[in-house]
Amino acid sequence: MAYRLITQVVVVGSRVLGRAFAEAYKQAAASSQYQRAQQKNGNAATGRASLTSGMTLDEACKILNVNKPADGTAANMEEVMERFKRLFDANDPEKGGSFYLQSKVVRARERLEAEIKPKMEEKQAEEEVKEGWNPKIYKDR
């Protein structure tokens, strides 16, 4: 009779563990599928930047008080750098500022750079293609 009880405990326990592992596998598969879909939708650069800095584009724009980058112009990047320098210096811990706020300002700049730099590089490449490649080989030309 003790063998029957032990056998039942083992069978019921293995069923419970089997179901738990199956459910955990389903959740892991769904999570990885969702992550692949996010990267496939073109959010790869945005997702990477968001994962590294942990900050959304809206949050970064609010911290530095700039508009969302529309076309990735150099003027937009200059504005970001100007605001960054001012806020970074204002929150210097040696001058009574907050290191936490200073690090938030740095993360906001990094997030905006990750968004603007690829657009600027793409724009420069398009301009090069439009103008053509004109190497300056001779001084008189």
UniProtKB/Swiss-Prot annotation:
Location of the region described as J-like in the Swiss-Prot/TrEMBL record: 59-117
Gene: un-4
Alphabetic keyword roster: Membrane, Mitochondrion, Mitochondrion inner membrane, Protein transport, Translocation, Transport
Biological role stated in the UniProt entry: Essential component of the PAM complex, a complex required for the translocation of transit peptide-containing proteins from the inner membrane into the mitochondrial matrix in an ATP-dependent manner. In the complex, it is required to regulate activity of mtHSP70 (hsp70-5) via its interaction with tim14/pam18. May act by positioning tim14/pam18 in juxtaposition to mtHSP70 at the translocon to maximize ATPase stimulation.
Source organism (scientific name): Neurospora crassa (strain ATCC 24698 / 74-OR23-1A / CBS 708.71 / DSM 1257 / FGSC 987)
Superkingdom per UniProt: Eukaryota
Localisation per UniProt entry: Mitochondrion inner membrane
Protein name listed in UniProt: Mitochondrial import inner membrane translocase subunit tim16
Record Gene3D superfamilies: DnaJ domain
